[in-house]
Curated annotation (Swiss-Prot):
Keywords: ATP-binding, Glycoprotein, Kinase, Membrane, Nucleotide-binding, Phosphoprotein, Receptor, Repeat, Serine/threonine-protein kinase, Signal, Transferase, Transmembrane, Transmembrane helix. This is Cysteine-rich receptor-like protein kinase 42. It is an enzyme of class 2 (transferase). It comes from Arabidopsis thaliana. Residues 315-604 form the Protein kinase domain. Residues 35-135, 137-236 form the Gnk2-homologous domain. It is found in: Membrane. The lineage of its organism: Eukaryota, Viridiplantae, Streptophyta, Embryophyta, Tracheophyta. The gene is CRK42. ATP binds at residues 321-329, 343. Glycans are attached at residues 79, 151. It comes from the Eukaryota. The chain crosses the membrane at residues 252-272.
Amino acid sequence: MRCLTKTRSFHYVIIFYSFFFLPFLSSSSDDQRTTVSGLFCGGRSKSSADPNYIPTFVEDMHSLSLKLTTRRFATESLNSTTSIYALIQCHDDLSPSDCQLCYAIARTRIPRCLPSSSARIFLDGCFLRYETYEFYDESVSDASDSFSCSNDTVLDPRFGFQVSETAARVAVRKGGFGVAGENGVHALAQCWESLGKEDCRVCLEKAVKEVKRCVSRREGRAMNTGCYLRYSDHKFYNGDGHHKFHVLFNKGVIVAIVLTTSAFVMLILLATYVIMTKVSKTKQEKRNLGLVSRKFNNSKTKFKYETLEKATDYFSHKKMLGQGGNGTVFLGILPNGKNVAVKRLVFNTRDWVEEFFNEVNLISGIQHKNLVKLLGCSIEGPESLLVYEYVPNKSLDQFLFDESQSKVLNWSQRLNIILGTAEGLAYLHGGSPVRIIHRDIKTSNVLLDDQLNPKIADFGLARCFGLDKTHLSTGIAGTLGYMAPEYVVRGQLTEKADVYSFGVLVLEIACGTRINAFVPETGHLLQRVWNLYTLNRLVEALDPCLKDEFLQVQGSEAEACKVLRVGLLCTQASPSLRPSMEEVIRMLTERDYPIPSPTSPPFLRVSSLTTDLEGSSTISHSTNSTTTFNTMVKTDQASYTSSESSTTRTI
């Protein structure tokens, strides 16, 4: 009974703290760059089970706070039965009070990882990490480094170019810190002060490569072992990026000290709570899981975190299969010997619960040979994990666009991939228990099994709707170049948006060229294929790697041209003119099935088409052709103007 009374009393203290202190922390977090960009928890070890581990951790955090009063960087290590090493780095443009405040927020958030033996947290103004070994000179790590992209999309292609330029420029600044802002793009780069110049350079060069994968989004962040790089379409750093670190006990510093002290109190309370919960899980903890636990509490979908941790060798770098904007995928071997793919999720938005369970809810109950099967998830460990069937080969884009792999796929295999993807989409649109729109069909989301059969993956953006509805109205999300025009302009989502994305995919597979690859003489891929179609020279658009096969296999070249026509049908400007996926399958498989003549895709000015591709100077095209909707063709079937583009463009 005494134990129960203490537990309840402790919960009352936590509640009191939450209502009294947290409003001050959250109210300040909008201006002082204390938004959490990423929290990464390591595995558990014998040292983290030591009774002295959490008290040592609390002492380390307090010592860092004292050191941070005179500078923006500090390290601390306490040697007891369990050694803990910690590092804090504020960005060089932060004032003393903002640095203290950022650390106060970080040290209240990072205990969420306890009792993990390691953790790191990135805020927009500082970085905090602890380990059981000395890590201060580490620069990069393929297993731990991550990046994140915002959800909202920028439609101006010049923005992506400016991001690449600005990020590269800020990364070469000397001294381990730099900011830059030009043409609506602002960037900040920061190395930890414990790194040498060469290690800093290596870390930031990798960071630049990572944020370049976000260039179509308004913001991107690279969160590496030894550095941080962020870009945005608005200025987020202070002044010119430099702030002298004077120790002045002004109002801001006093507020920061008070908040830091309160954070320290919270740490002590939290440490006590962790120790108590290691002995016994209370009923209150189970109720906090609420609907989440009840929904996935059957043995078929629920995995223990410890099982997946061991299956991946504690998320070993050697088991890493790939990395994306919202997590890293590892190969796992279950106790029964079965191979699975374990996705270790990174949540950096307030809507992470919706993002996580959207994918679980939609695909846990559907099965098709051309859809990656979700086997289950883990939600009660220090981080959330998704478990998929293991698909041994890489994604389609690595076969098509990697020069060393581009000749691996012959035409027969490419046609099989196109047909399999079509069958998977047809199942989602009408054959599954609910109608599902994928919203992000692209080459990197089509995986290939050991027989090079396609499997559609990544249902994080998918949406379902009832049979009685004609469309959904929603903010846009997806990948530029693959998104249907009516969806981008009006926010109206139907199955025909997936059909458009599929059409782009077909053109990429048959031509061996990325949709966003721009050639000054011929424009983007969609422009080039359409121009050649109007000139009756469609064969020139096909991948040159297939030329020898077309010469050897009679009829294969004509078949490939037929597939290109189907791709053009799917990318027509008007959704009503695009075929359904069932019709696409019939066009691809039935020799006598009629294939209509396609109308012009969006983004093109039909009157500017020339009768001779070789006279490139007479071809008019817009460099914004795949992303700017104010310059679209006006045809009898579709008209898109700026007056229609008032849709909110975020999820």
